[in-house]
Amino acid sequence: MSKNAGVVRELMRAFPDDVVAAQDDAEARAAAAELLIEVSVPEFVTAMVAPDGWSSERNGVEGFFSSWGEFVAGFARFAIELEELIERGDVVVVLARQHGVPKGGSAEITTDGAAIFYFRDSLVERLEFHLDRAQALRVIDLEA
């Protein structure tokens, strides 16, 4: 496993079991911020990418947290399950299954998504979270 893949695995291990519940956990947030600062360039980009091409980009640790906060705002519970890591030079792709229960609902919604981590000098410079796995794989020239 490359150093970059090791960084991604470490970040994924640090991801909370329930992203919604972790929004108000100051200790978990501080630990995640410390790890992000350690493994990323100072103004790394977090991009949330929808299937229709819409995206939102924010910079730095606070941008990461605000992006995720907005994304999970409509959920009572939200979790990410790591399925596979794909390495491609300075890019690492995480294939993941997302599980969420909308606020006011009881049925779980499950989708297959992906995250693309772009590295420079073994530091994360860009993170893209894709709701559409096939679209993410096309971005890096892989077939779904």
Regions found by a protein language model. Name each.
Residues A30-D90:
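A solvent-exposed, acidic/Ser-Thr-rich amphipathic alpha-helical stretch
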Residues D24-D25, G60, D132:
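Intrinsic-disorder/low-complexity, polar/charged segments
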Residues M1-E34, E38-P42, R138-A144:
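Short, low-complexity N-terminal intrinsically disordered segments enriched in polar/charged residues
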Residues V20-A21, V49, G53, P102:
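Residue-level detector of alpha-helix boundaries and kinks
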Residues M1-K3, V7, G69-A144:
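A beta-strand edge to alpha-helix "cap/lid" segment located at domain peripheries
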Residues R13, P42, E62, A115-F117, ...:
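Short non-domain terminal segments
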